[in-house]
């Protein structure tokens, strides 16, 4: 079954949160095991971050009831386009994680909805659609060196 996520704006923290489609309206993670991501150490992921809810290719904090630690998701295929040469999205997102002024939340929300989520809807399973993880979050990806399908749960 394909994993589907929705994008929700959290105005209180000025970040975009990824939520599994089918989660409760209050943004709580879906129950049940969706696959595993081994953690570098048991203490690397707090208990309230729902390590058992890890989806292949996503850091466990993506499923926290508080949302992911930082705005860090994008499409690798879009990273290769000339559009991103002007926006320099990774640098923009990194500035936001440091609390510096950069692209507005509205612009970022539009970028994600247009580029990433539209790809998921139109293309379905796309092995080149990846997760881009910025530094600063301790919930790192621990796999995905080669193309893999993080749309499908384990």
UniProtKB/Swiss-Prot annotation:
Gene: X
Family in the record: Belongs to the orthohepadnavirus protein X family.
Top-rank taxon: Viruses
Stated name of the protein: Protein X
Subunit details: May form homodimer. May interact with host CEBPA, CFLAR, CREB1, DDB1, E4F1, HBXIP, HSPD1/HSP60, NFKBIA, POLR2E and SMAD4. Interacts with host SMC5-SMC6 complex and induces its degradation. Interacts with host TRPC4AP; leading to prevent ubiquitination of TRPC4AP. Interacts with host PLSCR1; this interaction promotes ubiquitination and degradation of HBx and impairs HBx-mediated cell proliferation.
Post-translational modification: A fraction may be phosphorylated in insect cells and HepG2 cells, a human hepatoblastoma cell line. Phosphorylated in vitro by host protein kinase C or mitogen-activated protein kinase. N-acetylated in insect cells.
GO cellular component, one term: host cell mitochondrion
Subcellular location: Host cytoplasm; Host nucleus; Host mitochondrion
């Amino acid at each position: 079954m394909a994993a589907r996520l929705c994008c929700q704006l959290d105005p209180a923290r000025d970040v975009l949160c990824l939520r599994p489609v089918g989660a409760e309206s209050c943004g709580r993670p879906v129950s049940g095991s969706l696959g595993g991501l081994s953690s570098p150490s048991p203490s690397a992921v707090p208990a309230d971050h729902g390590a058992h809810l890890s989806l292949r290719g996503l850091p466990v904090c993506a499923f926290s009831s508080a949302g992911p630690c930082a705005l860090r998701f994008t499409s690798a295929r879009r990273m290769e386009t000339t559009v991103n040469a002007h926006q320099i999205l990774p640098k923009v997102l990194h500035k936001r994680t440091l609390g510096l002024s950069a692209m507005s939340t509205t612009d970022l929300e539009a970028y994600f909805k247009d580029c990433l989520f539209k790809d998921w809807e139109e293309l379905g399973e796309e092995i080149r659609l990846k997760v881009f993880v910025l530094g600063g979050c301790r919930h790192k990806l621990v796999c995905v060196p080669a193309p893999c399908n993080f749309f499908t749960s384990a």
